[in-house]
């Protein structure tokens, strides 16, 4: 009986020693897995016949809030949550509210990304492929093709991982009472 127990113990030890260890996550995968908020300045380039360049600030918070504040060349604010998108254009005195049909908010995109052989991360949501590249352990650029087949590249700078962001900034509150609100 003792010999049987010794053999059993050796077999258990060998099986444990040779068991596959769980895959270790890369630094970038760890960031994506634990990301609860994100803040960065951005440069957005829309490549078509005549490239358009926009600058602004992004604030995003899990589970699905995002605020894109475009500062140049035109001012615009885009508020996103899991239900709707509000596009406020102060120069036009107008806010357009559209239901969010597809889960294409910032965090849904980030949570669905899969690491590629080249080190980038990709996901496809409703026929749109998103590609994220990290630099210095932080999201650096996000690329995708828009509905008109234009390549959009968003480059992040001054990125902060998990900063404290107040929930209130994600709620659209008109700064001017005389704006038109269009519901689509």
Curated annotation (Swiss-Prot):
Cell compartments where the protein resides: Periplasm
InterPro entries per record: LolA/LolB/LppX (IPR029046), OM_lipoprot_carrier_LolA-like (IPR004564), OM_lipoprot_carrier_LolA_Pbac (IPR018323)
SUPFAM superfamilies the record matches: Prokaryotic lipoproteins and lipoprotein localization factors
Keywords: Chaperone, Periplasm, Protein transport, Signal, Transport
Signal peptide (UniProt feature, chain positions): 1-19
Highest taxon above the source species: Bacteria
Function of the molecule: Participates in the translocation of lipoproteins from the inner membrane to the outer membrane. Only forms a complex with a lipoprotein if the residue after the N-terminal Cys is not an aspartate (The Asp acts as a targeting signal to indicate that the lipoprotein should stay in the inner membrane).
Protein name per the record: Outer-membrane lipoprotein carrier protein
Species annotation: Helicobacter pylori (strain P12)
Gene transcribed to yield this protein: lolA
